Curated annotation (Swiss-Prot):
GO biological-process terms attached to the record: cytoplasmic translation
Cited function: This protein binds to the 23S rRNA, and is important in its secondary structure. It is located near the subunit interface in the base of the L7/L12 stalk, and near the tRNA binding site of the peptidyltransferase center.
NCBIfam families linked: L6_bact
One of the record's GO molecular function terms: structural constituent of ribosome
Keyword terms of this UniProt record: Ribonucleoprotein, Ribosomal protein, RNA-binding, rRNA-binding
Gene3D superfamilies in alphabetical order: Ribosomal protein L6, alpha-beta domain (3.90.930.12)
Family to which the UniProt record says this protein belongs: Belongs to the universal ribosomal protein uL6 family.
Organism this protein belongs to: Prochlorococcus marinus subsp. pastoris (strain CCMP1986 / NIES-2087 / MED4)
Quaternary context: Part of the 50S ribosomal subunit.
Any GO CC annotation of this UniProt entry: cytosolic large ribosomal subunit
Listed name of the protein: Large ribosomal subunit protein uL6
Entries under Pfam families matching the protein: Ribosomal_L6 (PF00347)
InterPro entries recorded: Ribosomal_uL6-like, Ribosomal_uL6-like_a/b-dom_sf, Ribosomal_uL6_a/b-dom, Ribosomal_uL6_bac-type, Ribosomal_uL6_CS
Source species taxonomy: Bacteria, Bacillati, Cyanobacteriota, Cyanophyceae, Synechococcales
């Protein structure tokens, strides 16, 4: 049995969970999330917690046990607290700004790169070099942050590029010149 899947998901007072077959809807103060769960897992809602159990003893059912529990936990946390990823832009002349809802990144190309956020995602820019991506769905927040980082990933020689705020770039030594 999955060690993660064994523990029940606690549901705060402000959150309501609706389970219909494999479809789970979580509503909270920040919004609503709906997700279709994979087969092979049963969900039991008891008072203020959800217990996830494998439907059978087969391997595919046990594999999805911990996954489904974590997905539900992430949904509950998303509608109560939300998620955010912070990125840093390093390099001379590289900066970001918000135009309306869109994020415009100048990262050393001949043209600025404009990104339109999906529903439920907001971009915030502090001091032209710090970008915050926030929303209620952990997966979408992470994907959007990864798309922004992929515009100009950090390079190992000088560290220029777009990186996550807590990311450590492993630096390389440059070429040693002739003497």
């Amino acid at each position: 049995m999955s060690r993660i899947g064994k523990s029940p998901v606690q549901i705060p007072e402000k959150v309501s969970v609706d389970i219909k077959g494999l479809s789970i809807t979580v509503k909270g103060p920040k919004g609503e999330l709906k997700r279709l769960m994979p087969e092979g897992v049963n969900f039991d809602q008891k008072e203020n917690q959800i217990v996830v159990t494998p439907a059978t003893t087969k391997r595919y059912s046990r594999e999805r046990h911990g996954l489904c529990r974590t997905l539900i936990s992430n949904m509950v946390q998303g509608v109560t607290e939300g998620y955010e990823k912070k990125l840093e832009i390093v390099g001379v002349g590289s900066r970001a700004q918000v135009k309306g809802k869109n994020l415009v990144v100048s990262a050393g190309y001949s043209h600025p790169v404009e990104m339109t956020p999906p529903d439920g995602i907001t971009y915030k820019v502090e001091s032209n070099t710090n970008v915050t991506v926030s929303g209620i769905d952990k997966e979408i927040v992470g994907n959007e942050a990864a798309k922004i980082r992929s515009i100009r990933p950090p390079e190992p020689y000088k560290g220029k590029g777009i990186k996550y705020q807590d990311e450590r770039i492993i630096r390389k030594a440059g070429k040693s010149g002739k003497k």
